[in-house]
Amino acid sequence: MSMLDLLWLFFMLTAIQPVVRQKLLETSRQRVLSRIERERNSRVILLIHRQETMNLLGFPLFRYIDIDDSEEVIRAIHMTDPQLPLDIVLHTPGGLVLAALQIARAIHAYPGKVTVFVPHYAMSGGTLIALAADEIVMSPHAVLGPVDPQLGQYPAASVLKVVEQKPVADIDDQTLILADLARKATDQIRRSVVELLKDKMDADRAEQVAAM
């Protein structure tokens, strides 16, 4: 075998190794999922977004909540017996507001008991999804995060803060437009949180939580 053949073999093994590792990880997750379902007599849905080296040559791939996730989770919920408890394992940095809101509303409308498990973190849209559940179970050091929306690379709350601190005459048109979008997005999220919480607490308390 020549040096060129060895280099080619090394390249091929390096390329497929992340794929093999990902398949093994998925198989392991499926075994754990099945065991939890048997022990709790429930339907378990995983919504896990963590940095995993699963593309060519093992470069990190970051995942967030997207429309594909909402389609898969909502389909799984609709295919579950309404009498069966629903357990959702949530580990995500957040993602697309529309997708997270769709999942949250589907969970909120589910007639059976829904429990969300947060082993490490559920930020932004992940927190929105968690708030839709009947019960949230977290590990001792797990965290939830604020549900403030993002406008591209900018947090909506930060855009609004800039507008509050500067005179309107000193703010360019683009920033004013962003501020208007940020205000609308923030109001939408606040109303959505109230909608998800109003059957779990009184209206005033729901408004207070939504404003956090």
Named regions from a protein language model:
Residues 1-121, 128-212:
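Terminal-region recognition feature
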